[in-house]
Amino acid sequence: MMRLRGSGMLRDLLLRSPAGVSATLRRAQPLVTLCRRPRGGGRPAAGPAAAARLHPWWGGGGWPAEPLARGLSSSPSEILQELGKGSTHPQPGVSPPAAPAAPGPKDGPGETDAFGNSEGKELVASGENKIKQGLLPSLEDLLFYTIAEGQEKIPVHKFITALKSTGLRTSDPRLKECMDMLRLTLQTTSDGVMLDKDLFKKCVQSNIVLLTQAFRRKFVIPDFMSFTSHIDELYESAKKQSGGKVADYIPQLAKFSPDLWGVSVCTVDGQRHSTGDTKVPFCLQSCVKPLKYAIAVNDLGTEYVHRYVGKEPSGLRFNKLFLNEDDKPHNPMVNAGAIVVTSLIKQGVNNAEKFDYVMQFLNKMAGNEYVGFSNATFQSERESGDRNFAIGYYLKEKKCFPEGTDMVGILDFYFQLCSIEVTCESASVMAATLANGGFCPITGERVLSPEAVRNTLSLMHSCGMYDFSGQFAFHVGLPAKSGVAGGILLVVPNVMGMMCWSPPLDKMGNSVKGIHFCHDLVSLCNFHNYDNLRHFAKKLDPRREGGDQRVKSVINLLFAAYTGDVSALRRFALSAMDMEQRDYDSRTALHVAAAEGHVEVVKFLLEACKVNPFPKDRWNNTPMDEALHFGHHDVFKILQEYQVQYTPQGDSDNGKENQTVHKNLDGLL
């Protein structure tokens, strides 16, 4: 089954014509098909009769209960205030096209579906027809039952708490329609803090694909709550670090308290976490160097940019008046290289237009979160920038600038870019855009080319931490860039971006707490560029469920079958768990349910999850043998009848996980 990673698939669909979208969706897996609205209008939903029949299976249990999110109340006024945070983002959320799609071309006789088999087309068409007839539940129904835990209504605060436990925020632009509808519902209904199924479906239908991904734990960090607890522990450990000195060469930097300390995380799927002083604005300073280099390469290409600047670490202080053997700055991360890169951006226009252009670019990278400007810092930098003026004149004498460049004007622009303000939260989204191949994770917009991202990360890895770059690459092994304001922009490629900020600096000019945090992070998690992902078992890998989790999943599955907890089994199936997992005696959940005589569990496993009714344990006993041995004749009869209908599924090239998702979700739907 295709995995919906981020919003790439939706972006692709939205760029196509209606006919193209229809053809694509009909060839896709049922998960995507069910997100479409019927051609006759309305939305896919189970009819009342079907809902009544399905309620014993779908109605109980659901998403695990979580404590209320920080600062979240169940009162209507405070929930409205919480939901109101999403209204500041002008970017609309990514959602499936609402217009009816035109019929696409028919599949040829030799075509296969998204699962690599020719039966997928019939499954999709059959599922689509049944949904139109109200015989099967929609994804919105499944999501409702997942969260409701057997209740007829969902408290709004419970939905928001469950949403936050996945790492998504109510302010996420991709959830704008959902949050707007929730806000409207709270204002217009008498029972504003409770959502029945119809109201819930109305609220989530525009963003159902993203929400389904979130609640099925299909984001890059599946267990985000556990991961953030580790981040908080590392934060507290680094907070104890003393020493270092706040930069004081200009008064605007010296005014910051040495006790300020914040860490923000944003994954490539838009999962967010912040701890500490993450909303305090500070200047990017040298952290802007990789960003403006990325802009230059994105606009002009690698070959043109590197006519003027090299790619090698200099081995010297970042502000030395020194060029390489070709009379070019060594790299874009030293002051000389950054000044030259600044001269390449939007040549031929005045500084005001250049500055607006870069600000708009950085706003896109930050997903329209806070990006500001400190005029006081700019004025102070210009007044105390004698060394940078000396570097500028040296570069001019060596003809390092493009022809016709106004060197003094370029230095003004350079000081302006150093004075751009961010918060830890907005800068973490910028870092996540670099981690995500140039796509902003919270808007889905492509901001940078893959070439620009690759080159930027390479230079951050080798030259980003001043004179500490070699040691940082050795010990931490991740692309990063530090600044004199105390920030460290850290990128874990294909996983997440982070901003660590604490003003006290070590003798190399890097944040003391930030360096300590980065070391601890890589000691705990296998994020180092050269950690062996397959054999390095001593480190935590937040990107996948570990061995302990797999053991727990078998225990939880068999225990739910033993106790007859259909609600838990439904939740496991929705999370794409393998419902045919075996214990050390090769016994499955169906063995246990048959031995205990749980009719509803047996029906659920057979009819909804489509498990194999013939599995044999270590003693060659099948579930039918278990039912007969313990005298559960009703279960024996069900198994006997189902064996006639069962068709074994062969192996496919898509892997066991895709088969599991196909069986579970397609069976559930």
Swiss-Prot record:
Site residues, Cleavage: L72, S73
Biased composition of type Pro residues is found at 93-103
What happens after mutating F318Y? No effect on catalytic activity. Loss of inhibition by BPTES
Chain spans, region Disordered: 68-118, 647-669
- Give the sites modified to N6-succinyllysine: K130, K164
One Pfam family, please name it.
Answer: Glutaminase
Cellular component aspect of the GO annotation:
cytosol; mitochondrial matrix; mitochondrion; synapse
| Record-listed E.C. numbers | 3.5.1.2
Q: Where are the ANK repeats?
A: 585-614, 619-648
The organism's place on the tree of life at top rank: Eukaryota
Q: Which reaction does it catalyse?
A: L-glutamine + H2O = L-glutamate + NH4(+)
Let me know which tissues express this protein, per UniProt: Isoform 1 and isoform 3 are detected in brain cortex. Isoform 3 is highly expressed in astrocytoma, ganglioglioma and ependymoma. Isoform 1 is highly expressed in brain and kidney, but not detected in liver. Isoform 3 is highly expressed in heart and pancreas, detected at lower levels in placenta, lung, pancreas and kidney, but is not detected in liver. Isoform 2 is expressed in cardiac and skeletal muscle.
Matching SMART domains, A to Z?
ANK
Instruction: List GO molecular-function terms, semicolon-separated.
Output: glutaminase activity
Renumbered to this chain, the Basic and acidic residues biased-composition regions fall at 653-669
Q: What's the family?
A: Belongs to the glutaminase family.
Q: Anything noted about its domains?
A: The C-terminal ANK repeats prevent the assembly of the supra-tetrameric filaments. A highly mobile activation loop at the dimer-dimer interface is important for enzyme activity.
User: Which disease appears in this protein's record?
Assistant: Developmental and epileptic encephalopathy 71: A form of epileptic encephalopathy, a heterogeneous group of severe early-onset epilepsies characterized by refractory seizures, neurodevelopmental impairment, and poor prognosis. Development is normal prior to seizure onset, after which cognitive and motor delays become apparent. DEE71 is an autosomal recessive form with onset at birth. Death occurs in first weeks of life.
According to the record's subunit comment, the protein's assembly and interactions are:
Homotetramer, dimer of dimers. The tetramers can assemble into rod-like oligomers (in vitro), but the physiological significance of this is not clear. Interacts with RAF1 and MAP2K2. Interacts with ATCAY; the interaction is direct and may control GLS localization, negatively regulating its activity.
The protein depicted here goes by the name Glutaminase kidney isoform, mitochondrial
State the organism named in the record: Homo sapiens
Question: Which gene name belongs to this protein?
Answer: GLS
